[in-house]
Amino acid sequence: MDEFQSKAFEVGEEIEPDDNEPLTGEEYLQRVKWHSNRCPSVVVADIDYSKIKVTIPSNSYFTLPPSITKCKKELLPTPTWEKEFLNDFSEFRQKLQYIKSNRPSNNNNNNNNNNNNNNNNNNNNNLIPQLPHINDKRYWYIFCFGSNGNNNNNNNDIKMKDFNDNQEDDDDDENNEDYEYNENKEEEEEEEEEEEEEEEVEEEEEEEEEEEEVVDYSTKKPTLGNKPTMDILCRLDHVLTVALVNYHIEWLEKREFTQERSYWLYMLLSLLEKPIDPDTCSNLRSCIRRLSVFRSKITNLNDPNLPSINILFTIIAKYFDQLEPSDILYL
């Protein structure tokens, strides 16, 4: 370690300590040098696990993730197809970035849509879907794939979190009204004034949304999922794209493979910029393991999901380089 540390000043040869105290500062440093040269580089404490409530640690530091599931060789894409597809995918990404960079800003699109809606109020194609918040995973799922078909669950699934929070606060206020009224009437009047102010703010927000012709997902009616169109993709920045990629991979871990999921994953991966962060790398690795499980269950070469699975697998494994050398043995 001495060669990696810069010296502040020269110290003489080390001196073996004795019972006498050092007479000078230099003599003290020489004794410290003698002790430091005899300290081990690595020290391991001898812990008696019988005296503490901790299990003995295992020899391995972490559990290895599962390997890629094997499938029939005829289900795998050929190297020639992979090479041609990766070239096409790279060109598609460049065209997508070009379209996104040269597309007018969202404010201009909103103004144009508002003018069109004033001329034709019955045209529903000009409605602009309102993007959920980046952290609102639940309503991003509804935005992409729609709400549940059950009418009893629709009301609960379509309501926004802010609306639920306000309703819970109102219920708590109603349960405590009797106690608060008897204790202090002035507190009730203040609460009523605050509620009136909140209602006025909500009414103003609703009027602004009606003027902008924006689709509101807080309605109680069942909603349909949105396809990954250019209007939506051009409104996604890098941070939101990374979050949506991780969301869709997490949903794929818990649900079956569908064409709608493959469309969204393909377009989001087309927008995903390199280099990718470690968390996204880990999620992409989980995604190809999940895709390998889906592919291993396919028995028919004419299965409609097989091309989509191979496309997503090739993008993650080859384009984003998430295929380990040990995984080649399972392909």
From Swiss-Prot:
Disulfide bonds: none
Biased composition (Acidic residues): 11-21, 165-215
Cellular component terms (Gene Ontology): Gemini of Cajal bodies; nucleus; SMN complex; spliceosomal complex
GO biological process, one term: spliceosomal snRNP assembly
Subcellular location: Nucleus, Gem; Cytoplasm
Family under the similarity heading: Belongs to the gemin-2 family.
Name of the protein in question: Gem-associated protein 2
